[in-house]
């Protein structure tokens, strides 16, 4: 990875702290040639637009196999690729691999059928002078998929399809808004708040 990324030269051999994993939700492509393979719902491929520190996710597509993978690239994008051109917009979406139109009715139907999943786009680590963006890591993704939260909110979301859109996509409870790994992290943070409170009370005695 570092060979193609001059910005990583100073980090070779170091262990960096992960501060975030970036994911995209996915649904089966509506294109028959994709045979139900999942494609991402992405508003933008940008990771950072800061001048001199531009970074974005570049999709490497193999149309013959109906597959894709994500690479993190830095600097200004090459002509022909616009990171602002995601796969989902107000008017609908498109299949990342084939370009086939993917309307919201299709996305909603897949969500309601429990077919909405996630795919890792990038890993964010703490660098010497700010954030550093790395390619997706299969081992990290595998660990995230094994997460089992000790608790999750079972309360139902408001049923108001006009103003509250998430139930339209199969997300009916507050727990549905988060992935298992996110719920695990939130429960951990909540537990730590309780421990901190107990520590403060103990120190006040």
Feature locations, PLM:
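Charged, often flexible domain-edge or linker segments that flank or initiate folded functional domains
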Residues: 1-205
